[in-house]
A protein has these predicted regions:
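FIC/Doc superfamily catalytic core
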Residues: 1-185
Length: 185
């Protein structure tokens, strides 16, 4: 699914945040990571610390690779769920009513994704990259949080405005609900 530029625009009304730096100590990065955790209903400080560690690792890198994605997932999930940290899923899963690609296809699909979107540098391409990453659902858990870390990294590397998606369940018209609609969920 291709997303138009109009759909990728962030409105000031919904809280645009323009980060023109990849400074890993940025207060705005921490807010992005906190909201990213909250979207998944992960509220503890350990998970936020690990998200920040994953960001500090990721932001130093210049090229998006399969190994980089796996290491980012490993850092993010090491204390939360060590058995799956840094490993692609080994079972079939569904997200809501959507059946994700078979686990046997995940490695190939993620490799193709890296080739197609690894150098994405426009708002439209970066949003499409994020949507396609989430649809591949390469991990047993942590997909949304890793996907949003990559999304943030690509926006910062491209010197584009960063939108913090507010976790606002159960509001059916809130930012989080609109965000999930991008994935057809």
């Amino acid at each position: 699914m291709q997303i138009s530029k109009a759909q990728t625009r962030n409105s000031a009304k919904s809280g645009d945040i323009n980060m023109k730096t990849n400074n890993p100590s940025s207060k705005l990065v921490k807010e992005f990571l906190r909201e990213s955790n909250y979207i998944e209903r992960v509220y503890d400080d350990v998970a936020l610390e690990d998200a920040y560690k994953a960001w500090r690792y990721l932001v130093k890198k210049e090229e998006l690779t399969l190994i980089l994605i796996l290491k980012t997932h490993g850092i993010l999930m090491k204390r939360l769920w060590p058995e799956i940290a840094g490993r692609m899923r080994m079972e079939d899963v569904r997200v809501g009513s959507r059946i994700c690609p078979s686990w046997q296809l995940v490695y190939g699909l993620l490799s193709e994704w890296v080739k197609k979107y690894g150098k994405a540098n426009t708002e439209e391409d970066i949003l499409n990259a994020h949507i396609e990453f989430e649809r591949r659902h390469p991990f047993r858990d942590g997909n949304g949080r890793v996907g949003r870390l990559i999304f943030l990294w690509q926006l910062v590397k491209a010197d584009l405005p960063v939108k913090i998606i507010k976790a606002d369940w159960p509001d059916p018209n809130g930012e989080q609900a609109r965000y999930y609609k991008l994935f057809g969920e």
